[in-house]
A protein has these predicted regions:
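Acidic, proline/glycine-enriched N-terminal capping motif
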Residues: 2-113, 118, 247
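Conserved, structured C-terminal
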Residues: 2-38, 42-53, 126-302
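Short amphipathic beta-strand starts and helix->beta connectors
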Residues: 60-67, 112-122, 149-152, 197-205
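Generic hydrophobic, aliphatic-rich segments that mediate packing or membrane embedding
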Residues: 61, 76, 86-91, 108, ...
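Acidic active-site catalytic centers that drive phospho-/nucleotidyl reactions
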Residues: 73, 122, 217
């Protein structure tokens, strides 16, 4: 597959590099990641082609996470914008965390369950404004959210392709971002986010990640993706910034005790036998289940 013209023609728009027969999509960063990927090892992630390693082995990328700064393309995450007067109530009915106490600019990690209290998926909820949120997830949830939202005063937009995302993880990540951000990140708390700009380009930054180390996730308009990638690599050179693939990320998230759908658990939507389904308590996520909040899907079973 990698001898295909889609990898040879670097001038093609990332939207057009696959035909209807290829089944895979390309990230807004692919024009950069494909040239940097010495190993040409790739994985499928939510229908996208994602780098496994950039170098022939993962060691340097792993140690960049732990000792320097690692730059990861996380654009394949599913991203949905929920906006409107009933947005808080909708999300509160979907997830196990108490969304009513989520502050503007705060991010909450949460699972969500089926009626039997078995986990469908997990992800984050970002409160962008009074009545506007972004929810991220590993697999598609748009139809399910739309179904639950029936009759509510909300709009739901699939933001997965229009918003690109990068993770900058590691002990040097804050210094790199402070060197280009219009707003200092020194006071940004864990699981909070801010809007800022990099040399005039608008971005949002959340102090979140999947490594257990100091790190941030950067949310970018798709059309600005390459500008931001180039800027980060340029400003991060002296800090040891390293493009990093999913292999090193896997090791880091295991060390941090963070779970992954289809590896550590099976979505209750897809489990063929009942014993493959898991409750949040069985996954070590009991801390994220708030039984004293308003009713939510699966609460009675839990």
């Amino acid at each position: 597959m990698f001898n295909s013209p889609i990898f040879e023609n670097k001038s093609m728009s990332f939207k057009n590099k696959f035909t209807a027969n290829t089944q895979l999509k390309l990230s807004p960063f692919f024009e950069r990641t494909s040239k940097l990927n010495e190993s040409q090892e790739w994985r499928r992630w939510s229908g996208y082609l994602s780098a496994t390693n950039y170098e022939l082995t993962h060691e340097n990328e792993y140690f960049a996470i732990r000792t320097k700064a690692a730059l990861l393309d996380i654009s394949p995450l599913k991203k949905y914008l929920i906006d409107g007067p009933d947005a808080s109530n909708l999300l509160d009915s979907l997830v196990t965390r108490n969304i009513q106490i989520c502050k503007i600019g705060q991010v909450m990690y949460t699972p969500w369950c089926d009626e039997n209290g078995k986990v469908i998926d997990d992800g984050t909820v970002q409160r962008l404004s009074e009545n506007k949120y972004r929810i991220t997830s590993a697999e598609p949830n748009l139809d399910w959210i739309n179904h639950i939202a029936t009759g509510m005063n909300v709009s739901i937009l699939d933001d997965s392709e229009t918003t690109a995302a990068l993770a900058l993880q590691g002990p040097n990540s804050r210094e790199i971002l402070n060197s280009i951000s219009g707003t200092s990140l020194n006071d940004l708390k864990f699981f909070y986010m801010i809007d800022t700009n990099f040399n005039g380009t608008q971005v949002s930054i959340s102090r979140t990640g999947y490594t257990g180390d100091l790190g941030y996730e950067i949310w970018i308009n798709q059309e600005d993706a390459l500008v931001i990638w180039d800027l980060l690599l340029d400003k991060g050179k002296s800090y040891g910034i390293t493009p990093t693939g999913l292999h090193a990320l896997d090791i880091s998230r295991i060390e941090a005790g963070l779970i992954l759908l289809d590896v550590d658990y099976v979505s209750s939507r897809h489990a063929i036998i009942e014993s493959r389904k898991s409750s949040p308590f069985e996954l070590g996520l009991g801390w994220a289940v708030k039984m004293n909040k308003n009713d939510f899907i699966g609460k009675n079973a839990l």
